[in-house]
Curated annotation (Swiss-Prot):
Keywords: Metal-binding, Metal-thiolate cluster. Expressed in roots. Metallothioneins have a high content of cysteine residues that bind various heavy metals. The keyword Metal-binding applies. This is Metallothionein-like protein 4B. Belongs to the metallothionein superfamily. Type 15 family. It comes from the Eukaryota. InterPro entries: Metalthion_15p. The gene is MT4B. Coiled coil: none annotated.
Length: 79
């Protein structure tokens, strides 16, 4: 990382790991206690609609990250 842990690209402010959309929330997220509930059972097979919605979600902002490139710029700038 060539920019000392922070770089900015539009609304994307990359901090600590240079891949987080909102680096200031990282501390709040890591200190929050969460519990998980696992439900075991049988579910119907995914239909065409659910598959398409899942693919659309994967191609959105959540699927793209920023990494710190040269001159303190996010690379790629697609977050």
């Amino acid at each position: 990382m060539s920019c000392g842990g922070s770089c900015n690209c539009g609304s994307c402010g990359c901090g600590g790991g240079c891949g987080k959309m909102y680096p200031d929330l990282a501390e709040k997220i890591t200190t929050t206690t969460t519990t998980a509930t696992t439900v075991l059972g049988v579910a119907p097979e995914k239909g065409h609609f659910e598959v398409m919605v899942g693919k659309a979600a994967e191609s959105g902002e959540a699927a793209h990250g920023c990494s710190c490139g040269s001159s303190c710029k996010c690379n790629p700038c697609n977050c």
